């Protein structure tokens, strides 16, 4: 009787159930809030750079002392920025800063002095233009300083491609090669104006399936396929390793899921808007983060799929132990869930955080997590990096 009952209980356990763990207690909690934390970069001396595009500030934090100083200032000139959105480690202790408002990439040296700038976008977005449009909004930078971006995949007025390339750019704007191709998010497109004064608006469909990807320090690229939830590692030496598909339950998108998605978009700064204006042959491009959130009353303004894809779109973070942290979609109100995969594509662990919290980066033996309060203000916490 007991054996029969025990067998029945085992049958009821889902085949894809995972043992879950937490990160434990934080080793440091920064006491002051941020408008939104776009990205973090741990400096060699242990300080942490934080780009806050909504507060329009670049901070250097001492997590242990609980202090911060502003690096640079707001403006359009040298040592200035508008909407600092991302910070990435470069060789020699330098840092790459994404300055959205000024449409440029800025290099800071090891002393955090502003060195030089380059435009985010180059090329011609029009069909049959002189050169293809390249928009350098980094998803990752490897230890050699190669920058990785997702190709735009559409010219101004051209068709919307279902898949695009992951581009590796040597020296920020030198040789470009395509590492892999990924499925992109579904969109809704609208156009206005005439041939010489034309506007195109492309709006992503929330929670539509999209491959996610990231880069390890050695330049290996990991792609998470949204169709069957499997990983592919594209090695810097040209080799490819494919992991087995992971079982998953596709979460039905109800009102609660829609509200949670829009709230998360708002507290994380929303998406990046790219504006392209062509007037009398002159091309102007602008970049801005914000406006991605929405109230419950705005839910019906969007097209929604019936179910969530298995994974979050965007960047897959790779930790110092060469493990990919993949955020998995769950029902509204459930803990934030990260599946951790090794270089062979095997699932090795599952980590959960409080609902809505997200992993933002890694440092020397640590994980940085963004926590939100009831007012959607951002706080930065540091945890020990789990070894298994």
Locations of regions flagged by a protein language model:
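Bacterial N-terminal signal peptides
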Residues: 2-13
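Eukaryotic scaffold repeat domains enriched in small/polar residues
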Residues: 16-388
